[in-house]
Regions:
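Secretory/organelle targeting and membrane-embedding segments
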Residues: 1-140, 145-480
Length: 480
């Protein structure tokens, strides 16, 4: 914790899509559960020309659309917390008026900054100009934080002129998901897994982040970024680091992030033969015809909408264990999961093909369903006169069913509450971000050097056939 709980929250981009779908519903839900300090005031700012009343109407419509009815209790009192100040971030004098609107917090100010990368520097200068960057102010930064290591340096250096690292909260919303946090509990609160969590007992790990959607209004950003920078550089590498990290000394921000960055720095440079890129063409998803990427974009493009990578972590625990990463748009289903495949038993005592055991698998479902499945080998019931027959049996834990009482929360609820209260454990430190970019930039450099262009795949499929071959040449099948 950084010493104070804020009693003012300043939301940049307060009339944008993220605020409408995630931030305002999350804050209202926290308020309904009495998790926000009664003194907390929330000031929204954006270019939209609204007053307090207009912003409250905007927020009410957002809550009615995106927050379930059973979580809207006390919506009227939440709306009374809200006020609004229009702002052109490129004009310094606007920050004087914004500072007047924010007022003088008794305890401290938390800022949530979601803006285009080009506006980070002028916004930070404006906050300094308006006196909104003092010792009792912390800032949360929503991606994208650059498009490569160099631009990330520029943004982080600009932020550091006003906010030291202990008051800078870089957001990766995947870390706010309950099952992602549960990965640490699964590993470090259960003695059965940790002794096996290494190259001696694990054959390989798969991490899949699949989307059914296409561009969905992110045309400009996505065509500049592509799947590697949009998904792998942040979300997927954070998941990988949680799977692979050493046990931290304790569960606090410094200890957890120290171990994550060790993993990221141990990532082996990827050869071009260990990657596959793709771009979707027209097809069908859920029985509905969908256009190809170029059709949605309105022009030809070499941007990848799919990437598969065979990664390695060069340290003692994970030497030569492949980590297969796969993400893409317009895939058959929306799913995020981690699959850990253990090695086969070294010798089977059971004779015959029917007794051939399959390796154990641990599957951690992150979205849409939050579940944990461990596959074990068991004897098929019956009188086995020709020898025991074995079959894999799944042990399923559906997390919402296992914990029937707690609400299923939006990932941003956890992150906004931690930003307000000053807990950095689930936020990304600068050295993590830079280690991620360094690895991703090297992959992009390999692509450019070898003139790699995306292979095509049909929307509704699991990507280019080359992605299947990437795993199958190692005797591995993607978990689907």
């Amino acid at each position: 914790m950084t010493g104070f709980s804020a009693d003012r929250l300043l939301l940049f981009g307060a009339t944008g899509d993220l605020a409408k779908r995630m931030l305002l519903p999350s804050l209202c839900a926290l308020d309904a559960d009495e998790l926000l300090d009664p003194k907390l005031e929330i000031v929204g700012t954006a270019r939209s020309d609204l007053d307090d009343h207009g912003f409250r109407n905007f927020a009410r419509e957002a809550l009615e659309q995106f927050l379930p009815a059973d979580r809207r209790s006390g919506m009227a009192s939440f709306l009374n917390r809200l006020s609004y100040q229009p702002l052109d971030a490129s004009a310094l004098d606007g920050f004087d008026r914004l500072a007047e609107k924010v007022g003088t917090p008794e305890q401290g100010l938390a800022i949530f900054l979601s803006t285009a990368p080009s506006l980070f520097e002028p916004t930070i200068r404006g906050l300094q100009h308006g006196g909104l960057s003092g010792e009792r102010v912390r800032i949360g930064l929503e991606k994208p934080l650059g498009i490569d290591l160099a631009s990330s340096h520029v943004i982080n250096d600009a932020v550091a002129t006003a906010f030291p690292e202990d008051r800078t909260f870089r957001i990766d919303h995947y870390l706010g998901k309950e099952t992602v946090q549960n990965l640490l509990a699964l590993r470090f609160a259960n003695i059965m897994f940790e002794p096996l969590w290494n190259a001696t007992h694990i054959d390989h790990v798969q991490i899949t982040v699949a989307e059914t959607v296409g561009l969905e209004g992110r045309v400009g950003f996505y065509d500049d970024a592509g799947a590697l920078r949009d998904m792998v550089q942040n979300h997927m590498l954070q998941l990988l680091s949680l799977v692979a990290m050493e046990p931290p000394v304790n569960y606090d921000a410094t200890a957890v992030r120290d171990e994550k960055v060790k993993v990221l720095r141990s990532l082996r440079p990827v050869e071009v033969s260990e990657t596959v890129t793709g771009q979707y063409r027209s097809g069908a998803i859920g029985g509905q015809a969908v256009p190809g990427y170029d059709d949605e974009l309105g022009k030809d493009s070499d941007t990848e909408t799919f990437v598969a990578i065979k990664a390695h972590i060069d340290n003692w625990r994970w030497k030569n264990v492949p980590f297969y990463l796969r993400t893409g748009k317009r895939l058959p289903e929306r799913t995020t999961e981690i699959m850990v495949q253990f090695r086969r038993v070294p010798h089977s005592i059971f004779p015959g093909k029917a007794a051939r055991g399959e390796p154990n698998k641990l599957v951690i479902g992150i979205q849409p369903a939050e579940n944990i499945t461990l596959s074990l080998m068991a004897k098929v019931p019956g009188l086995d006169r020709d020898g025991i027959r074995l079959r894999g049996v799944p042990l399923d834990i559906a997390m919402p069913d296992a914990f029937a009482g707690p609400q299923r929360r939006i990932a941003y609820e956890r992150l906004l509450l931690d930003l307000i209260e000053g807990d950095q454990t689930l936020f990304v430190r600068r050295d993590e971000v830079e280690a991620q970019w360094e690895w991703v930039d090297a992959i992009r450099a390999e692509w450019e050097e070898h003139g790699l262009t995306p292979k095509t795949y049909t929307a509704g499929s699991w990507g280019p056939s080359a992605a299947i071959a990437l795993a199958e040449r190692d005797g591995v099948t993607w978990h689907e």
